[in-house]
Amino acid sequence: MTRSSPAQLSRFLSEIQNKPKKSLSQNFLVDQNIVKKIVATSEVIPQDWVLEIGPGFGALTEELIAAGAQVIAIEKDPMFAPSLEELPIRLEIIDACKYPLDQLQEYKTLGKGRVVANLPYHITTPLLTKLFLEAPDFWKTVTVMVQDEVARRIVAQPGGRDYGSLTIFLQFFADIHYAFKVSASCFYPKPQVQSAVIHMKVKETLPLSDEEIPVFFTLTRTAFQQRRKVLANTLKGLYPKEQVEQALKELGLLLNVRPEVLSLNDYLALFHKMQAG
């Protein structure tokens, strides 16, 4: 019987006299077909090293091991430690947001790794931000289950209401594919939201230097703080309005353009103009 079995999970929770913690977004996968589909989507092959965040009871962990992966699992809740320690993995009982990713440096001798996870929904954005800002050159792919609403924001295109600074941030680092939707019935307990799996292929090279990247994201975050306003006005706290308007003109963009209209490449071109003065 697999760890994605509802009966197995129920037995485990009964044995430890505990229940899922809503505060930690503990909604466990209890559908083996979905577990297998996530691992297939992740492109994991034997000898890959994989970072799994929030393994819980280990349904996804078990399938990753079966696929031949070396798994490093980061779990905040110590109640799962005894069960996870039965598996041939490296286990870290710590808040993933506080885990120093440079501790995984030793695995880079094996090549780039992968991230595969059913992410705790309340910390999805901080975790994804951490993965790419702290260790962008560690990963080949990132395959994660997230809230469907967040998934649609991540893969959004310019001009839509879902398009925003998170979209630009993640699309800067990776080519992203909305893989499939996951019903609430595939979890225990059932979440109040729909879920989806996204697959990110991390870019080999980035268009900005390490020093430029945080400055660029300051620009994009500032732009979307008032997304319905004219871009030249939203950026006036960073640059003179006249300078922004001149840059927009040189790029062939309207002076009254709003933040959600510009593509990632448009923002990169604007950034270079602003940096050049």
From Swiss-Prot:
Q: Which GO molecular function terms does the record list?
A: 16S rRNA (adenine(1518)-N(6)/adenine(1519)-N(6))-dimethyltransferase activity; RNA binding
Name the chain's protein: Ribosomal RNA small subunit methyltransferase A
Described function:
Specifically dimethylates two adjacent adenosines (A1518 and A1519) in the loop of a conserved hairpin near the 3'-end of 16S rRNA in the 30S particle. May play a critical role in biogenesis of 30S subunits.
CDD domains listed in its UniProt record: AdoMet_MTases
The residues the entry assigns to the signal sequence are: none
| Chain's gene name | rsmA
Does the UniProt entry include the keyword GTP-binding? no
Q: Which reaction does it catalyse?
A: adenosine(1518)/adenosine(1519) in 16S rRNA + 4 S-adenosyl-L-methionine = N(6)-dimethyladenosine(1518)/N(6)-dimethyladenosine(1519) in 16S rRNA + 4 S-adenosyl-L-homocysteine + 4 H(+)
